[in-house]
Amino acid sequence: MGFRLPGIRKASKAADAPKGYLAVYVGEKLKRFVIPVSYLNQPSFQDLLSQAEEEFGYDHPMGGLTIPCSEDVFQCITSCLN
């Protein structure tokens, strides 16, 4: 059993995200998600960005944007943005 979040693309092994998308790393295992850049304007996603800034500043361990929440919380928030 599974579900699909249309706004989130399956992370590929390529380091680059497609045009209009951005890679973020989420959860303890730093799972990679590729999300639309339009999420950056959403208040609920901006809250996640504020948490990331408080925890990591501008030094993100994966080299990309790291979101300090569980994968479940991230998927719940992003599913509401679709």
From Swiss-Prot:
Keyword ATP-binding belongs to the record: no
Domain of life of the native organism: Eukaryota
Stimuli inducing this protein: By auxin.
InterPro entries, per database record: SAUR_fam
Keywords (A to Z) from UniProt: Auxin signaling pathway
UniProt keyword annotation of Translocase present: no
Similarity annotation: Belongs to the ARG7 family.
Name of the protein: Auxin-induced protein 15A
